[in-house]
Amino acid sequence: MLMPKQERNKIHQYLFQEGVVVAKKDFNQAKHEEIDTKNLYVIKALQSLTSKGYVKTQFSWQYYYYTLTEEGVEYLREYLNLPEHIVPGTYIQERNPSQRPQRRY
């Protein structure tokens, strides 16, 4: 599907930033809930990444759930010209500073 490159870049940037995208199965929806673009563009762009093996798709209750794979991280890092130390949000583990470290036996 032909779509403007700016729209594709928005989708790819959001996917890399978050690591996960949720899209409602509504092709006529004017705008995606989180990305400032058409919902159809989001579904089709991520469908393309799924066919290349960069994204894993799960469908449940009229919603598509897209998760980024290891190959997808490398592809988007190259596509968006990002350095190695930048990783998706799903790869970052937040640690509660008040919580003590777990003891290993």
Swiss-Prot record:
PTM (free text): The N-terminus is not modified.
> Any idea which GO molecular function terms this record carries?
RNA binding; structural constituent of ribosome
A single Gene Ontology biological process assigned to it is:
cytoplasmic translation
Functionally, this protein is described as follows: Component of the ribosome, a large ribonucleoprotein complex responsible for the synthesis of proteins in the cell. The small ribosomal subunit (SSU) binds messenger RNAs (mRNAs) and translates the encoded message by selecting cognate aminoacyl-transfer RNA (tRNA) molecules. The large subunit (LSU) contains the ribosomal catalytic site termed the peptidyl transferase center (PTC), which catalyzes the formation of peptide bonds, thereby polymerizing the amino acids delivered by tRNAs into a polypeptide chain.
Quaternary state and interactors: Component of the small ribosomal subunit (SSU). Mature yeast ribosomes consist of a small (40S) and a large (60S) subunit. The 40S small subunit contains 1 molecule of ribosomal RNA (18S rRNA) and 33 different proteins (encoded by 57 genes). The large 60S subunit contains 3 rRNA molecules (25S, 5.8S and 5S rRNA) and 46 different proteins (encoded by 81 genes). eS10 interacts with GCN1 (via middle region); this interaction is direct and promotes GCN2 kinase activity.
An annotated GO cellular component of this protein is: cytosolic small ribosomal subunit
Q: What is this protein called?
A: Small ribosomal subunit protein eS10B
Please indicate which superkingdom the organism of origin belongs to. Eukaryota
Q: Which UniProt keywords apply?
A: Cytoplasm, Ribonucleoprotein, Ribosomal protein
- Coiled coil ranges (UniProt) are none
Q: Which family does it belong to?
A: Belongs to the eukaryotic ribosomal protein eS10 family.
Q: What is its main location?
A: cytoplasm
Any additional notes?
A: Present with 7650 molecules/cell in log phase SD medium.
Where in or outside the cell it occurs: the entry states: Cytoplasm
